[in-house]
Each structure stands twice: as structure tokens, then as C-alpha cells.
Design a protein with these regions (language model features):
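Extracytoplasmic "Venus flytrap"/periplasmic binding protein-like
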Residues: 1-59, 63, 94-105, 204, ...
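A structural signal for short loop-to-beta-strand junctions that line the ligand-binding cleft
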Residues: 14, 21-22, 53-92, 244-250, ...
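Extracytoplasmic/periplasmic substrate-recognition and gating elements
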Residues: 17, 96, 186, 225-293, ...
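Hinge/lid segment of periplasmic solute-binding proteins
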Residues: 29-85, 140-143, 148, 233-235, ...
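Short, solvent-exposed loop/beta-turn-alpha elements that line the ligand-binding surface or hinge
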Residues: 45-59, 103-105, 149-175, 225-227, ...
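Extracytoplasmic/periplasmic solute-binding protein
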Residues: 66-79, 84, 94, 108-165, ...
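Glycine-centered hinge/linker elements that transmit conformational signals in sensory
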Residues: 111-115, 159-193, 237
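Long, aromatic- and glycine/proline-rich binding clefts that accommodate carbohydrate-like moieties
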Residues: 228, 235, 287-355, 385-405
Length: 405
């Protein structure tokens, strides 16, 4: 199984070599506007029935996200929910004298639990195992912790500013990164983490090598199939000791599958998509667990796994819909196409903290924030878009953002 980063690299190489499949997903980190401008996809609206288009839940097909100038280019894979909840091993909890029915709720309780598990494990297991080679996963986690502390840093890959500035040097972001610094200092992070992709970390967690794992609902069906006796549970991401000042951020359904511009039989490709998103197939994959459909009415009827239902309910209660500039201000698409990535990025900074190569966490974030601000401003200038298009004064991070305003 390919990790997200590996899939992105494989797809991008195939597309640039002219070997793209007839149907392919939008590579991670690539905006739809960029893909369309480079001739990767062809519009599919003419090949889809209105009944099919209307079957998607509200917010699934948005201008600037799945659609450009009224033409649908890609479809979302699933409804987007929080994918950074915390799984924990109930058996390890009991072995370490922790109550599996009362998991940690605050940052200090979480760090303390990780330390207790690590000390009790004595090399057999550790407090937490991370997908350390997947910078994207680490950035998603860090943004989640920071947003809960009030950073208003939005979801992975989304540009947001507060008073015209990015939030990456905020006190909330710095305190979130300090969690990883403390876990590393305590020796609570599994030592193999820095080299692990998400599937490997997931597998080792199920083998009893750590007390905690931060990932998404996709873990559940894998463990049901491969580790049927694994005694796991799920909890919300812990909040700061003085209480949450935001929710775990997520945006609306994201772009996924489109028809290649080189596809010679787009009608057949569209027919495949019609079946893929049909109620029968969507109901089956929802009932299998680990999947939340973007087709209206399917989730309520088909979700049957109790752990998946618990994950879904926690995601809905702790997660808060954040503003997506692409959906709210479509002109921002040109900014995204112009912006240059700053390295090390947030995920790579977390990697450095885990590995011990970054000890000045505040300084690392200050530098990243300054470099990012310059890159964002340059992209805005090149696109002729004011940076205020990425600022949402009406955004209360403790509530779902109201897209109807």
C-alpha cells in the first residue's frame, strides 16, 4: 500500500510523462486550478446526469474546489470529517494502571499518560507511535492541536490569516509544538516513528507497540480485518489545560477523482463514476466501516460498526468546519497556484523535533512564519489578490463556519 506522499509522487510522475490513467485522483498538495490549467483533467459535467449531480450532499461540489467556471472537473472521495482523533490500546491502559474508560482529556494528562505507558513498557511499548516519515500527517496533527488552542490555523494546505498575518508563530502554535518536544524529551515517542509511514505505524500500533496513535477512521476496517482481537478505543484530541479555544478543524468535501484530459472514452469513465457513487456501492463501503459517504442519506442508513459510529460522533462533536478560501473566494485559486512552498514545512519541523535536530521550537516557528508570510504575500501580489481574501473575521473556531453568510 502506498502512503499519501508516495501516491502523490507516483501520480505526478505519470501525468508529466503522459501516462496518466483515464481516471485519477488529484495528487495531494495540488490545487484543482493548477491541474486544470496544466491540462490534466477534462470537464465531466456533460457526461453526468442532473439526478447524479443532485445526489451529492450539500457542500460536496463547490466552485473552486471540485468545479471551475461551473464545470465539474473532479468529484470528492468522501464526506470530509476530522482525521486526527486519538486511538488507544485498552489492554495497555489496564496494564499501566490507566482507566480505559476515562482517557486523558487535557494536554498535560495526555503527556503524562504517554510517559506512564513508556515507563511501564520498558522498551516493549511506548506512549505514542507516529507516522514520522509522512510530513503531511504530522502537519495535520500539529494544526489540529494548535487550532484547538485557538490558533485559527485552519486545515492542512489551507491558507488563513489573522489580522493579515499567518498564525504559525502564534502562542497557540508554539504551545502545540511543545507537546511534541515534551513527548520526545520524555522518550514517549516510539523510536521507529521517524522512519514510519502511516500504514506501518497503524500496523505496529495494532501489534501492541504503543498506547496511542493519531490517525483517521480508515484504521478501523483494517484492524477489523487484520487484527480482529485488537482491543482498541478512540477519543477526541486532548485540549489545553485551560480549555479548548477552538475545534479540530476540517473543511468541506475535497477534490478527488477526475477524468484525464487524454481519456479517449470519457462517457465510459463517467459511467464508472456513476456506479462508484451509486447508493448500492456507497452503502456497502460505509457498512464495512472507516468510510463516510458524500452521497445524501447513505451514512444514516448504512453505518453499522459501533467503533466507526463512535469515531463519527466524536469527529462531529469535536470537529469544527473551517472556512475554505477556495469555496468562499474563488479568486484565491490563482494565489494557490503561485505560492512557493517553504521548507522545512510544519510537518518537517515536527520531524526535526522528534529526531532531536530542532531544539529551539519557538525559533523554528518564527522563521517558518516569516518565510511563509513573504511567500504568501509574493503569491498574492503575483495573482493580484489582496491577502485579506484569506481572512475571515466572522470565523469563530469554536463553531462550524457558516458558509451561507
Amino acid at each position: 500500500m502506498l502512503s499519501g506522499d508516495q501516491l502523490t509522487q507516483t501520480l505526478t510522475t505519470a501525468i508529466k510523462n503522459g501516462d496518466a490513467p483515464d481516471l485519477f485522483c488529484l495528487p495531494g498538495g495540488v490545487k484543482l486550478s493548477t491541474a486544470v490549467s496544466e491540462g490534466w483533467y477534462q470537464p465531466m459535467t456533460d457526461y453526468l446526469s442532473q439526478e447524479f449531480i443532485d445526489s451529492f450532499s450539500p457542500g460536496s461540489l463547490n466552485e473552486g474546489v471540485t468545479t471551475l467556471d461551473g464545470e465539474i472537473y473532479v468529484l470528492p472521495e468522501a464526506a470530509n470529517i476530522v482525521n486526527s482523533l486519538v486511538f488507544y490500546n485498552r489492554d495497555i491502559f489496564e496494564e499501566c494502571g490507566l482507566d480505559p474508560d476515562a482517557p486523558p482529556e487535557t494536554w498535560s494528562e495526555f503527556v503524562a499518560a504517554c510517559k506512564t505507558i513508556t515507563e511501564h513498557g520498558n522498551g516493549k511499548y511506548y506512549g505514542i507511535i507516529e507516522s514520522g516519515s509522512a510530513a503531511q500527517r504530522l502537519e495535520i496533527e500539529l494544526r489540529s492541536f494548535a487550532n484547538i488552542a485557538g490558533a485559527k490555523c485552519n486545515y492542512y494546505g489551507v491558507m488563513s490569516v489573522v489580522d493579515g498575518q499567518n498564525p504559525f508563530a502564534s502562542d497557540a502554535m508554539k504551545s502545540a509544538l511543545d507537546i511534541y518536544a515534551q513527548l520526545a524529551a520524555d522518550g514517549s515517542i516510539h523510536p521507529d516513528s521517524i522512519n514510519l509511514d502511516a500504514p506501518s505505524a497503524r500496523a505496529m500500533f495494532a501489534q501492541g507497540q504503543a498506547g496511542f496513535l493519531i490517525q483517521g477512521s480508515w484504521c478501523i476496517p483494517t484492524w477489523r480485518a487484520e487484527n480482529p482481537d485488537f482491543n482498541f478505543d478512540v477519543m477526541a484530541l486532548p485540549v489545553p489545560d485551560d480549555g479548548a479555544k477552538g475545534g479540530n478543524p476540517y473543511t468541506g468535501a475535497q477534490p478527488w477523482m477526475g477524468i484525464s484530459a487524454t481519456c479517449e472514452h470519457p462517457e465510459a469513465a463517467a459511467l464508472y463514476l456513476t456506479e462508484l457513487y451509486g447508493t448500492d456501492y456507497q452503502s456497502k463501503i460505509v457498512s464495512d466501516g472507516g468510510f463516510v459517504s458524500c452521497i445524501e442519506g447513505v451514512n444514516e442508513e448504512a453505518m453499522s460498526d459501533p467503533m466507526m459510529l463512535k469515531y463519527y460522533n466524536l469527529a462531529m462533536s469535536s470537529g469544527k468546519l473551517s472556512p475554505d478560501p477556495l469555496a468562499l473566494n474563488p479568486e484565491t485559486a490563482e494565489v494557490y497556484s503561485q505560492v512557493k512552498e517553504v521548507t522545512p514545512n510544519l510537518g518537517q519541523i515536527v520531524q526535526g523535533v522528534m529526531a532531536g535536530s530542532i531544539t529551539d521550537t519557538a525559533g523554528a516557528l518564527d522563521t517558518f512564519s516569516a518565510d511563509t508570510q513573504a511567500a504568501w504575500q509574493a503569491a498574492c501580489d503575483a495573482a493580484g489578490v489582496d491577502i485579506s481574501a484569506f481572512e475571515f473575521d466572522d470565523w469563530d473556531p469554536m463553531a462550524d463556519y457558516d458558509y451561507s453568510k
